[in-house]
Amino acid sequence: YLQRLVDVIVANPPFGGAEDDAVKQNFPAEFRTSETADLFLVLMMYLLKDKGRCGVVLPDGFMFGDGVKATIKKRMLDEFGLHTTIRLPQVFKPYASVNTNLLFFQKGVPSRGVWFYRLDYPEGVKSFTKTRPMLDKHFDLVREWWADKQPIVVEGKDKARFFTVDELVALNYDFDKCCPFPHEEE
């Protein structure tokens, strides 16, 4: 097991899958769930070497989920240095109509807090589709922001903001309340 630890993981685990009891039994009791994406995330956390880094795509359900999801988020803050989350709009249409998130963390480093950045649709774009997919250039503003992370407020709503660990705990680990898309608040 220890020989298979890795320095870097970049992953897009399957969303919405349900694992049976035989698979769940391979995980510590506090992390047992049938949700495939959650189990993949826990596995990635265990496979990282100390100071190993991970970037992972997760569905919005992880952001607001409680129970095992909250336990995973707590562990990410306490021991895995979760530092940045990029909130994405629905980028996988027509295959999946779910908002997704990019989470970045480093094993063995407690989090001081988490930067959240909401990546809105570009001007004039109402959705990404098979014929009009999200492109690398749509991340240009994220890359600019990442180089010098600063809070951003657009029309009175947080687009980018740093949340302390205490603030995230006070939200009961409901990361969905951090820089949500405007239509989600209405």
Positions of the model-derived regions?
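A conserved structural/catalytic subdomain of Rossmann-like adenosyl-cofactor enzymes
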Residues: 1-186
